[in-house]
Regions:
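Short beta-strand scaffold segments in enzyme catalytic cores
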Residues: 39-48
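Short Gly/Pro-enriched turn/cap motifs at secondary-structure boundaries
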Residues: 34-37
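Compact, glycine-rich, soluble single-domain proteins
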Residues: 57-72
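Histidine- and/or cysteine-centered catalytic micro-motif in compact active-site loops
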Residues: 47-49, 58-59
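Feature captures the catalytic cores and cofactor-binding loops of soluble hydro-lyases/lyases
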Residues: 72-81
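C-terminal binding/interaction regions
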Residues: 2-32, 81-138
Length: 138
């Protein structure tokens, strides 16, 4: 499952389900990002084990440490709409290009999707275990 998504392969993956729908939803969420300081919009979308799609966008704060990543909004939407486990995830930047979640968000996603959560990343399709080996677990 370590496919490269450079060039043509990226276009193939983006056209496949569930990725096509998730990327579209992440791009839609990204349009609502509140980024008056960095101007760096991020949108995220995920498929839930019951078939729902949840999404989120980043929300900045003048005190940068209080900024909420798009993944935080996504997890909040997950629980506000009934909970469940994430099965597939993608996030995009302001141009709609695929991004890798930051370290904090990888830990957050692991909590709500586990080791086998599928992620579409800049380096291909990956499991959460591949992008966050030895995740912290209580």
């Amino acid at each position: 499952m370590t496919e490269s998504i450079k060039g043509a392969r990226l276009e193939e993956l983006i056209a496949e389900q569930p990725w096509a729908g998730l990327i579209e939803e992440a791009r839609r969420a990204m349009q609502h990002a509140y980024v008056p300081y960095s101007r760096f919009k991020v949108g995220a979308a995920a498929l839930v084990d019951d078939g729902r799609v949840v999404s989120g966008c980043n929300v900045e704060n003048g005190s940068y440490g209080l900024t909420l990543c798009a993944e935080c909004g996504l997890v909040s939407a997950l629980h506000a709409s009934g909970g469940g486990r994430l099965t597939h995830f993608v996030c995009v930047d302001g141009q709609g290009s695929v991004l890798m979640p930051c370290g904090r968000c990888r830990q957050l996603l692991h909590e709500h999707g586990g080791d086998q959560l599928q992620l579409l990343t800049v380096s291909g399709l990956r499991t959460m275990d591949q992008v966050l080996p030895d995740a912290f677990v209580l």
